Structures are given as structure tokens and as C-alpha cells.
Amino acid sequence: MPGRGRCPDCGSAELVEDSHYSQNQLVCSDCGCVVTEGVLTTTFSDEGNLREVTYSRSTGENEQVSRSQQRGLRRVRDLCRVLQLPPTFEDTAVAYYQQAHQLAGIRTARLQKKEVLAGCCVLITCRQRNWPLTMGTICTLLYADLDVFSGTYMQIVKLLGLDVPSLCLVDLVKTYCSSFKLFEASPSVPAKYVEDKEKMLSRTLQLVELADETWLVTGRHPLPVITAATFLAWQSLRPSDRLTCSLARFCKLANVDLPYPASSRLQELLAVLLRMAEQLAWLQVLKLDKRSVVKHIGDLLQHRHMLVRKAFRDGTAEMDAGEKELQGQGQGQGLGDEDVGSSSLELPAGKRPSSPALLLPPCMLKPPKRVCPAPPVSMVTGDEDISDSEIEQYLRTPQEVRDFQKAQAARQAAQGTPNPP
């Protein structure tokens, strides 16, 4: 057979293919010499008798790893090494990426979503192992848009059916506060702005817990709340030197980015602290404002559980309390004037005690303004004819029914038509 070479022993050209198990062999039919066996060769002259074997036939793989998947796997491994994650994290993130890349919704997605897929798999792995890592950190490393990243993250969790716990706020506070450059003196940080790390972290945790108890954290990004709490904790430890420092300058000194909603979270925290300060007798005479209340944050946090209960009332229990108050009004009418007078000794005449504020999320206390659609213009003038089927809705008494029947009979008689049976 031409084109297959000759037998090296007898020189015959009668070479045939013989399958030995799953291995193809080229055998001389005259002398039985095995010319080629498998894909391994020992000399350069043997290469002329070999044929090219495809990757899928030699390894049993039906599909090759695409270039985009190879780039994604490299990106996953690079992220894990940059973040200094344990090797087990890297293996889990790679496995999640390979599973997600096989999904039809991901393979046909646009390039922007595929680029953030590696970061989503790393974030899922860290969340499952309670490793403090935020979405913003991954987006900064990948130069990715936060909205695209969050949408892809939720899609991957849903498609893969993963159980991802929520981020531990305490661990996030410790990790985030450790990145502040305020714990050692430097040319960019004056000595009066340097603070002890443990004191600042302890007070920041208390302020974040207070924000969590008063609905300032629910449904929001945690970093703006933590930034505002860290700023207040830093100011309250040495208020005489730091009250003049603004939030923007504080973030610049600490070498951290200022989140956009941090100013709003700061004002909400100060409003909560003012409400709590109104419940302390020695602070009521000082007429505190949002700037001077920072000096007394230590006292407020020391009694925060009692002050929160006194300063706020639960919105869900408000209706129950109102019903009990209405029921007690009838019983209280028999009380004498002495009891009524004793309850209002400290209040001026004609004034009622102020009720505590509602303990509700800010989105319910100040709902966003929505455009109300204009009511449809009614073209009804009142002169329209009423059909016989609709007029029955306007009849109320039997007398009206009889009068209507008489009027209808008279109308038919006037028109010369016989009455219906």
C-alpha cells in the first residue's frame, strides 16, 4: 500500500492496520512485524509512519476549553493570589467558574458580564467561608461597574442554587477599619489626629450596632454606614481637637475613598444620637445640636439599650397601643381630678407630652417622592340617557318600582305599541 512506507525488516509494502484493544497498530502482513504502535516513537525515522491524531480522539475529550474560559480561569487564580486567599478557596472558586461557564445564560452573555464572572465566583467562595470581602473591593480590582457586578452575582447564585450567607458586619468593620492610616504618626497625619486602634475599633462597633438597631443598615451598602460610624468614633475620642475636621478631610487623612451616601448616613446617625440625648436628664439642659452631641457619644453608648427603648417606639405595636388607650378612656373617666392633675404637674397648661418617634426604616419615615398620575378626565355631564338595564340600580323602594312601571306603560301607550306580556 503506497504512502504507508515499507517494513523495516523485510522491506515489504504490505502494511495493514490492526486494532489491539483500543490501540491502533500498523503491522506488516508478510512477516508480522509491528511497524507502529500507539503514538510513542523512539527514532526520527519512525515519524514518517505516523499519522496525526486529534486532541479529542487521543484524550477522549469532546470539547476544548475556549480562550475566554482560559482567560477567566487565569483571572480567578490571579484574584485569589492578589487577595492572599488559601489554596482551598482558589480550588472552589475555579470549580464554581467552570460550572457557571457551562450555563447557557452565561455563555451567551455579553463580554462585560463574562469579565466580572471571575470576581463573582471569588466573592461567593469568600462569603461561604465567612471571609470578610466586599463587592467594592472586587470591583476595584477588576475595574468593573458595581451594578453589572451585583446583577451577575445574584444571577450566578440563583442559577447554581448556592447557599450564600450574608456578610458578617463585625468582621467587615474590623477589616475595613484596619485599612485606615490613622494609627501611626506620619507627615500627612498630625499627632492630634492619631488614635489608638483598639479604642477606635471598639467605639465604631458600638455605633454600627446602634445603627443596626435603628434600621440604618437594613437594605443598604455597609461601607457608607461604617465610614460614618468610624468618623463619629474618631471625633468623640478627642472632640476638642477633631470637631472642626470634616468627613471629607477625615477620609483623605485616612487614605480611604469617601462613599457617596456616607454624608447622609452621618446625618441619620446624628439624628438618632440627638433623640437619645433627649432622654438623659443631665443633657436636656444643654440644648445639644448635631455638632455638640458628639462630645457625649460615650455616655449615650453606655446606656444605649435603655435610651433606644425610651426614645423610639415600635411602629408595629403602635396600633395595639392605640386600641388599649381607647379602651382605657372609658375606665379613666371615673378617676378624680387629683389623678389627672398629678400626671401633668411638670407640663405647661394646654400642652401634651411629646410621643416617642417611630422606630421604622428611613424609607418608611421619609418615603421617596413619586409622580402621581393625573386623574382621567371625566366626560360625564349628567345628561346621558340611562338604559333600562341600568335604571334598576337607581330604584330603592317598591313604590319607585311601581311608578317606573306605570311611566313605562304610559310611554308605550303614547307611542301606539302594545304592552309586553
From Swiss-Prot:
It is found in: Nucleus. It comes from the Eukaryota. Its main location: nucleus. The modification Phosphoserine is found at S355. Residues 108-114 are annotated as: Interaction with target DNA. Belongs to the TFIIB family. This is Transcription factor IIIB 50 kDa subunit. The lineage of its organism: Eukaryota, Metazoa, Chordata, Craniata, Vertebrata.
